[in-house]
Structure formats: structure tokens, C-alpha cells
Amino acid sequence: MKILYAASEATPYAKSGGLADVAGSLPKALVKDGVDARVIMPLYGDLKYREDLEYVTNYSVPVGWRSQYCGLFKSVRNGVTYYFLDNEYYFKRRGLYGFYDDGERFAFFSRAVLETLFYIDFTPDIINCNDWQTALVPVYLNLYYRHLDKFNRIKTIFTIHNIAYQGKYGTEILEDTCGIGRRDQHIVEYDGCANFMKGAIETADKITTVSPTYAQEILDPWFSYGLDALLREKQYKLCGILNGIDMDANNPATDPYIPFNYSIDNFGEGKAACKKALQEKFGLHQDGSPVFAMVSRMVGMKGFDLVQSVADGLVDRGIELVILGSGENQYESFFSDLCARHPGRVGTYIGFEPALSQEIYAGADAFIMPSKSEPCGLAQMVACRYGTPPIIRETGGLRDSIHDSTMGEGNGFTFAGYSAHELYEACCHAQDAYNDKENWNNLVHHCMECDFSWDVSAKSYEGLYNEPANLW
């Protein structure tokens, strides 16, 4: 089985969000299982490990009515071959996204992915595309390449990591920039504009999302950002596969950033030492109170409006809070003020420090994730890996990965409705459970037993890749 994994970012080379973690981890897990999985991505101006890249060739790529240069480089890391597509006009910039011509940049990249197959000794069975930046790959494949022998058996999978970002532009971009003639523009047109993601949903052989629950949620108008009717029509080719985490990179037994390494065999001693260090760092009282933490972008979608409503009440109940993140000014201001109002009870760090986040995962007693919507979420899995039971709202991948322990089973605390009252009640349940040390230790042990490795996700993807031809 040969898989070409097309993504706009992948660790360790370039990252702006969770997509990079997936593109850097899933192919590695597939290769470990004997799949010939390769990654193709842009060669950005601030790409890491540029010194490892090997020049292969260059060629022209059609972009509307003109052609653009494309240089091809490659590198091999952890057994995975990475291809990098170079065009300095499009990609030699600071940052990955947010430019006025992003539509043109990634239309070029999508077309270049297919053109590259003429110049490498590799013909994939499946091209796995990811998010709107690669959404035109299946569109171009069906329109301009399917009749060629090299391409006529290639299947495509389109993975939706976050349906909120669809790649929407004015329809004038279609012919001039994307090279899609008027006869075929209906494939990409939606709601009066060009919608790259819509084109992929129409033309890809399979559609996946990053969790089973999210696959069901996006059929509902509340979650779909306008694409629910189309997705219900294409539901026969839609499924959800839960993402994983890098269990080696997130390992409390070897993590160089935490003050005391521990495993499932000595977590009591280890977490106590990490908690003490965390409380000292944030100036919190060491009086036996539980420490509940959040590591997240400070935006409403992550549930910060709920936390804002219950924070004072939680502190009054004897819970200490540690908050790490940045984002909307209203939340940054509130949690900075909260820290000032409750010295010794609340610690806030505005910004993001990877090392500090690891210290929080290890030192906190519980981890709060009350998201309004969460396609998959990785933080709750990392928290479990470090023996820190999550408190989550039942949505998306949170619902698929965390199960309520109130009745003696499960690996965290959950609530269903998006309300401050339900979040407060879940936190109270967690505090009560924390005070029962024997049951709490059993819960921590259960959390650390959870297998959220990419090996599990890779098996699910392999099952999809190997489905009989009649199911494609």
C-alpha cells in the first residue's frame, strides 16, 4: 500500500496547529506498520531543518492561464520520505497562512502535488488530503489527470480537521487563478463564492474527520458552517477516526521539562513533586488543595466564557487554578485580574511556553477542557498520559476519548450541556473525588493506562485504506 499524505504543514518542519502534529505522526506510524507512506508539503521560507533537504528537480506547474516554477526537494526522517515543493514567490514568507493570496498559493500547491508525480518514482494508491489548503487536489485529479494511465487508479481521501476553515474566496478566483473553467465551476461554487472544501467533499472518494463524534456533529447546522446539507448528501463516504498523540514525546518518564520524572509505577511520588514545583513557580499555597489547570488558546470556542463564570466560585471552594494561554483580550484581562484578586490561589501566564505546558500537565491534579466545539483535541490525551484526569464537555473528540468516572469507571469527568452550571458541578465532582485518595489514585492509574498512541489511529486508517474496491 502506497500513501501520499498531502498537508500544508507537518512537524518537525513547519507548524501552526494540530494538523502539523497529525501529518508528522500518522505517516510515521503507518511506515512502522509496513505502509509506504510519504508526505508532501510546501517549502516555507522559515522551514526547519533546511540543511537536510536534497534537491531533486524542477518543473512548471499550471496556475490558471500561466505556469509557475516549482522546485522539488526531499528528506527522509524516521523512515518517512518528505517531499517539499518550492516556489519563493508563494512560500518564502514569514509564517504559513494569513496572506492576501492564500487562495492562489494553495491552488498552486494542490496542482503541484499532482504534477510532482510525473517526476518521482512513486505512484500512490491513495492521496490523503488535509483541510482546505489541499482540497483542490481531488478536484484537479478528476478534471485534468484521471484520464492518464499514471493517475486513473489513484483514490483520494479528504480529511477535515476543522470545518470552520473552508477556503472561501470570490468566484473570480476560479478561472483566472485556479484554472477551473465555467463548465466545472459548480463543483467548487457554494453559497455564492468559491469554496475549496466543498470541492473536495464533492470529488474525494472518502471523507474523514478527526473523531467519530465530530463526523456526526458536522451533519448538524450548528457545527457545519453551512456545509451540513452537502455532508448529509455525502454521508455514505464520511467517517471519523480519532487522532492520537506522540507517546514518546509526551512521556512523564523521560520528559526533560518536568522537575521529576515518573511512570505509572511511581506516579504518587512523581506527581507530588511536580505539583510542589508548579505551586512554587506560580506562588500558590501548598495546603493540600487540588490544582486544576487549563492550557489553551483564550477564545470563546475553548469554553473560556464558562470558566470565567465559575472561576471565583471554584477558588472559594478551595480549588487552586493555573491558566496558560493567550488570545482574546477580554479573557487575558479577566484571568490576569483573577490572579491579582486571589494571590496564592490562582496562577496565570499570558502567552505560551512549551516547557511550561509540560510542567502543568505533570503538576496539575485535574485538567479543564470545556470546549464549545472540539473536532478532536489532543490536550486531554496528553493530560491522561501525565496522570491528570480531564474535566471535559462531551463534544467531538473529547467525548470519544474521555469517559465519566463518577460511577467508578472512566478516565475523567464529563458534562453535556454548554453551561457554566454544568461545568461547575463537574469540577465539584472532581474535587470530591480528589479528596478520596484511594479512588483518586485508581483514576490516575486508569488515565495513565489509556493508549492514545498513533499506532491505534494508524490501524483504523489502514482499515480504511484497505477497504474493498466496491466500497470506494
Regions found by a protein language model. Give the residues of each.
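Catalytic cores of nucleotide-sugar-dependent glycosyltransferases that transfer UDP/GDP/TDP-activated
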Residues: M1-W472
